[in-house]
From Swiss-Prot:
Residues 1-22 form a propeptide. This is Alpha-conotoxin-like Kn1.2. It comes from Conus kinoshitai. The modification Cysteine amide is found at C36. The keyword Acetylation does not apply. The cysteine framework is I (CC-C-C). Alpha4/4 pattern.
Length: 37
């Protein structure tokens, strides 16, 4: 369980950081908040 949780967190953190860094999040399904404009 511990390993699975860590693996999921490690995989999710970089993805969120990448999407947050990108200014364009309109057509990006990986983006939590779709920002258009």
């Amino acid at each position: 369980e511990s390993d699975g949780a860590h693996a999921k967190a490690r995989a999710d953190k970089p993805a969120r950081s990448a999407t947050n860094r990108q200014p364009g999040c309109c057509n990006n399904p990986a983006c939590v908040k779709h920002r258009c404009g």
